[in-house]
Amino acid sequence: MSAAMRERFDRFLHEKNCMTDLLAKLEAKTGVNRSFIALGVIGLVALYLVFGYGASLLCNLIGFGYPAYISMKAIESPNKDDDTQWLTYWVVYGVFSIAEFFSDLFLSWFPFYYMLKCGFLLWCMAPSPSNGAELLYRRVIRPIFLKHESQVDSVVKDVKDKAKETADAISKEVKKATVNLLGDEKKST
């Protein structure tokens, strides 16, 4: 590990949160530096993602759990920059999930797939302004979206209008059936 990366990693491990509190307790009880404990845990998770049963679930929990928690905190904060960061992550996560749906049958047979997927998701959620989600959104997803935005808007409007028409028709039929049912009930009493 380069000196700069090691320093950033060490600073990250000394930030105040529940995970670093746990690392501090483990460090105090064992006498082992928290950096080594964290690297050991990372190594075990990586090995589990390669060889473990349920690696898919663990990978999806990592890719969903922390971002969902931080997204809820972002919604509740007055700062809107973090909202944009996490909305960007969820857009990339959604696009990746759709792409993965069609390729998962083949990719899941590769031994390092879930470890690489987990690494990809961690890169996308990295706490930096130029993380993977931002890069992929800016360079891939956004240009495609802007190119097809008007066509997608048109399709969405058509589907929304048809759904409203269908809901109105169903509501009208339910009201009519209710009136008929109540009318038949009054006649029988």
From Swiss-Prot:
Monomer. Homodimer; maybe disulfide-linked. Homotrimer. Interacts with ATL1. Interacts with ATL2. Interacts with ATL3. Interacts with CKAP4. Interacts with RTN4 (isoforms A and B). Interacts with ZFYVE27. This is Receptor expression-enhancing protein 5. Pfam families: TB2_DP1_HVA22. GO terms for biological process: endoplasmic reticulum membrane organization. InterPro entries: TB2_DP1_HVA22. Belongs to the DP1 family. The chain crosses the membrane at residues 35-51, 54-74, 85-103, 106-123. Coiled coil: none annotated. It comes from Rattus norvegicus (Rat). Residues 1-34, 75-84, 124-189 are cytoplasmic. Residues 114-185 are annotated as: Required for dimerization and maintaining endoplasmic reticulum morphology.
